[in-house]
């Protein structure tokens, strides 16, 4: 049987084979095992690094969610109440975000509108500056509007002053009509502007009329009464005198006064001119009144007026009946010096409430010669001087001489 050399051990003569080393045993090589161990450690290290990465990522995500929740809570607090009431129950995060978006859009639209208005105003101001209008002109126009309104209101109220059923709606309607006329540029208001002037003229004659009563009463009624009595109503007796009323106080006696009145009746035109000149001289009443003032109605009395007069009956609240001076007889002229010093503000009372208003009394009253002196003496005015019933008419003329005439030329 043949030997298989590979199976047989080597011969002895052959060199000794080196010994086995650790590197000759691949299965038992520690480097291989080291490499295997080393790979496991790398795997562990990679797993640890992944775990360490996941831990901060979780923290970051948690913080991010916390910030989102905090912002949503603040938006929920900042939302208007009318938006919160649109939803019922608890507001979810998505609902809060939707409401916030809606509110922001509304605010954006409002801001855009305001911006457009601001731009329009700026463009208008620039156009106004280019046209030449300034602030002062605007202020004047503003004030003139109020003044025009106040003037129209005053004119309307003055025009309808006597109207009792005046309503505010009528005034407002009038103001609207005036505004429409002003806007249309109508010139019809120019014709209505003189309306207050006409009303002023209507109101003004009342005050000058009062002022002209003084000179009118001083001049006109005296001449008219003198002419009326000189035309034929005088009885021709010594009692029909004017006592210096018509500027005839410088005559010699009572006869000459009557003749002068008759002669003056012939030249009434010239006397009328003089009276007109006196009236036009000054419309204000004189500061000092030296004569009693009687109107035309007080100078003429008829028997029917005297009978129907309420002054003849006794009444405590009515003034006594008064007579002018030219009806006083010479026997009662003793009281004229007293009347010269303290003039009574009205006519001298000669009849009293206790006097019987009968026809006989009136007939005797119209004939002053038959009336006794004590009946004509005023009881309400105590006499500071003693009575002289026997004084002649010359004493009366002497007492009336210092009184200046009423700016009338006397006949030479």
From Swiss-Prot:
Q: Where is this region: Essential for interaction with BMAL1, E-box binding and repressor activity against the CLOCK-BMAL1 heterodimer?
A: 1-139
Q: Where is this cross-link: Glycyl lysine isopeptide (Lys-Gly) (interchain with G-Cter in SUMO2)?
A: 167, 279, 288
Name the record gives this protein: Class E basic helix-loop-helix protein 40
Which residue numbers delimit the bHLH domain? Answer: 52-107
Q: For the modification Phosphoserine, which residues carry it?
A: 235, 383
Task: Name a single GO biological process.
Answer: circadian regulation of gene expression
Tell me the domain of life: Eukaryota
Q: Name one GO molecular function term.
A: DNA-binding transcription repressor activity, RNA polymerase II-specific
Q: Which gene is this protein's source?
A: BHLHE40
Q: How is it modified after translation?
A: Ubiquitinated; which may lead to proteasomal degradation.
Which intervals of the chain are annotated as region Necessary for interaction with RXRA and repressor activity against RXRA? 75-79
